[in-house]
């Protein structure tokens, strides 16, 4: 199962032309794993932008569980892999990126089946099993960083792989906090980007992913403008093939 195109398409929106000067600087992030830890900053297009990337679930909570060829697919493993890939691309473009959920061992993985673990932490702290405590912990982490960061463009991105859609074709769904005009703008731009890229690369597929308000704890309680994405469903056979 792989969501490579998601990373690319998100970047069409997130790579804002703040200062699109080419650069060649070395970078290093151990969370990406030994093979991917080293990277080069090749552009300053996102210089001054800060992103708080949060993968769903983790630690004692695997999230939604799918079955594929005799293996269990845990939502948290795939959401985390997507977050790492997205974060690496953002950092290559000069952005400052905070990974709120972390696994010191996994790194970016290319296997079709990602092994499951409970090692994930919230920036080094054990993740509680209690749902409210778990969500509060990650919101507190985002907000503490948000208060310290000086940049003007600061956005939080939450990624889950448990879409409520049960159709054979599961699209990406975009949510923002109730009453958040900036959140609505962010999610609508994401939606339009996906629609455009599907028309370009898969013109016969169609795209029905919607934008809506959703009264989620993490959207209500994070200080930066936030988008919550359901990028598929780990239990959906078609998504498992992706």
Write out the residue ranges for each language-model feature.
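Catalytic-site microenvironment of enzymes
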Residues: 2-5, 9-11, 15-242
